[in-house]
Amino acid sequence: QGELTGLIADNGALVWRGIPFAEPPVGHLRWKAPRPPRPWTGRFSATKNGSACFQGTDLAAPFKDDDGDGFVGSEDCLYLNIFAPANTSSADRLPVMYWIYGGGNVGGHNATPGYDGSVLAQKHQVIVVAVNYRVGTMGWFMHPAFAGSGAGPADRSGNWGTLDTIRAKWFANDITLV
């Protein structure tokens, strides 16, 4: 989609955070299959995590419920993070690990403390891609009203969280390190 500016982790690993892999699933795209992101021009600043996907706080343990409503995150959450060992270039042809966080499809985040992809990248010489996906009713919800609401079967499936993780695989064709 374009060039990225990342950062260097304390352990020396290269890190890119908050890279959009789909259009935000809000408004008319809520409860629809993910759509490709809009390309950006210039360099994208990939230095901050994207938001956790909208979820209840009872299963989002490390996240703070700032307004006390029992929920955290945002519907605009389809972002991924990439971690690579220091001094890596495309010529190294390192393996890529695609990491999908746990949480029983009801909670979680690709930047959950304790799941630091930079450690794996640096220690095992692997590129780690950590993806966010819609959880709970935003990711798996079906209603008869959706039957005529989409352009195709994926929009009517009720499996948007799974489709998010499939959509995020665009990196397999696009990932290069310079």
Which positions does each model-derived feature cover?
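Non-catalytic accessory segments of hydrolases
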Residues: 1-160
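Short, well-ordered amphipathic alpha-helical segments that serve as non-catalytic structural scaffolds
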Residues: 163-175
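Short, well-structured active-site flanking segments
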Residues: 178
